[in-house]
């Protein structure tokens, strides 16, 4: 998963939010700025890096401020909008300065979310470490995580509190940011909250949390974000196809049907082989019984006499018939196998075409951003 998905829908909605924040005062309960100007302040020189001292950990409310870059808020909101009604999750990158946590950037995680919760698995942690080693400078580090609450405000649920408390105790300083994409888009104001947990008292399972004062900032390069989005228009022919998840699901079903058909054919052939063996043993027993009876009772007719060579020939014919049975596949199985294979190839070609279009889209964005420099 890429660190940010610039889908056309997300671009338009995020651009609308940026324009609204440039024209309207951003004094809200969660994202209020001490600056009286109506624009996001431009800060090219960030506060000095001051590590989190060990003696300061005794104060659970040491951190009171959170400085978030415009780049990070844009990526978080774009990721949350792209998730729709499903919660999304990502990591925050930055550093600390006295009682302030500075969030310079963020990146999304490949997690499985629902409408009410999001869970990170082992693959997500591996991706987090690999991304950190490849794209984040040594001066910066992970300072927290973010996730979305689509339509139900910015706060920490019980699971969020447990997650934040665990990470805060293990790798403090650690911050939790919650973004509500639906309220942000409907109100044209970024609905965001930053929180930290408080230690429990008397080993009580109930853990409380407190909000941090949020201030947004941008540098001189961030000012051109809106202009780049409004200036260049992506060809609709290379937009992302919303049917990609459904296509991946259908491709997976084709593979499952293929293995299921193979399994059914194998089990049926084995059953036929077992049945033929039972029939063969029964025939041999009957022939032995007839042979013994012909030896004990004298017969005047040679037609009723069975020779040992006849029994051996019968055994060979029975064994030959038992070997021929597995070659007879289930009626219609060959047609079903060919149909599944054809459907699989068709879905694979469609998915390949989608990936080619996405690659063309990424190349287009790269050319646009390089041309603007």
Swiss-Prot record:
Enzyme Commission code(s) on record: 3.4.-.-
Q: Where is the composition biased (Low complexity)?
A: 295-306
Q: Which cysteines are joined by disulfide bonds?
A: none
Tell whether Zinc is among the UniProt keywords: yes
Extract the ranges annotated as region (Disordered).
289-325
| Alphabetic keyword roster | Cytoplasm, Hydrolase, Metal-binding, Metalloprotease, Nucleus, Protease, Signalosome, Zinc
A GO MF annotation of the entry reads: metallopeptidase activity
Binding of Zn(2+) occurs at 147, 149, 160
| Subcellular compartments | Cytoplasm; Nucleus
Please list the GO biological process terms of this entry: proteolysis
| Transmembrane segment boundaries | none
Q: Where is this motif: JAMM motif?
A: 147-160
Q: Which domain of life is it from?
A: Eukaryota
Q: Which InterPro entries match?
A: JAMM/MPN+_dom (IPR000555), JAMM_MPN+_peptidase_M67A (IPR050242), MPN (IPR037518)
Q: Principal localization?
A: cytoplasm
The record's listing under PROSITE patterns reads:
MPN
Describe the task this protein carries out: Catalytic Component of the COP9 signalosome (CSN) complex that acts as an regulator of the ubiquitin (Ubl) conjugation pathway by mediating the deneddylation of the cullin subunit of SCF-type E3 ubiquitin-protein ligase complexes. The CNS complex is involved in the regulation of the mating pheromone response.
* Family matches, as PANTHER family: EUKARYOTIC TRANSLATION INITIATION FACTOR 3 -RELATED
Q: What is this protein called?
A: COP9 signalosome complex subunit 5
Organism, by scientific name, is: Kluyveromyces lactis (strain ATCC 8585 / CBS 2359 / DSM 70799 / NBRC 1267 / NRRL Y-1140 / WM37) (Yeast)
What's the name of its gene? RRI1
């Amino acid at each position: 998963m890429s660190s940010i998905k610039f889908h056309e829908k997300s671009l338009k909605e995020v651009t609308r939010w940026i324009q609204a924040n440039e024209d309207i005062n951003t004094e809200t309960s969660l994202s209020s700025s001490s600056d009286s100007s109506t624009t996001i302040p431009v800060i090219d020189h960030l506060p000095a890096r001051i590590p989190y001292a060990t003696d300061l950990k005794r104060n659970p409310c040491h951190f009171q401020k959170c400085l978030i870059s415009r780049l990070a808020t844009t990526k978080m909101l774009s990721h949350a909008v792209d998730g729709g009604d499903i919660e999304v999750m990502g990591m925050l990158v930055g550093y600390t300065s006295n009682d302030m946590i500075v969030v310079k950037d963020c990146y999304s995680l490949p997690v499985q979310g629902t409408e009410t919760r999001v869970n990170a698995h082992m693959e997500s942690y591996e991706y987090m470490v690999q991304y950190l080693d490849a794209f984040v400078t040594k001066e910066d580090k992970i300072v927290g995580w973010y996730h979305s609450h689509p339509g139900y405000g910015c706060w920490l649920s019980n699971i969020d509190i447990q997650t934040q408390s665990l990470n805060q105790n293990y790798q403090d300083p650690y911050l939790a940011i919650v973004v509500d994409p639906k309220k942000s888009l409907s109100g044209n104001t970024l609905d965001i909250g930053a929180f930290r947990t408080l230690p429990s008292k008397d080993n009580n399972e109930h853990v409380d949390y407190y909000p941090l004062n949020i201030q947004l900032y941008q540098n001189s390069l961030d000012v051109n974000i809106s202009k780049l989005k409004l200036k260049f228009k992506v060809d609709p022919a290379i937009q992302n196809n919303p049917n990609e998840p459904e296509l991946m699901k259908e491709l997976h079903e084709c593979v499952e049907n293929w293995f299921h058909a193979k399994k059914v054919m194998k089990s049926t052939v084995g059953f036929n082989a077992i049945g033929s063996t039972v029939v063969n043993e029964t025939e041999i027993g009957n022939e032995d019984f007839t042979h013994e009876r012909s030896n004990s009772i004298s017969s005047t007719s040679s037609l009723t006499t069975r020779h040992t060579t006849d029994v051996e020939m019968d055994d060979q014919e029975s064994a030959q018939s038992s070997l021929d049975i597995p070659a007879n596949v289930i009626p219609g199985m060959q047609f079903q196998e060919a149909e599944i294979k054809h459907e699989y190839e068709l879905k694979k070609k469609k998915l390949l075409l989608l990936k080619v279009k996405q690659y063309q889209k990424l190349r287009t964005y790269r050319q646009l951003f390089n041309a603007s420099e």
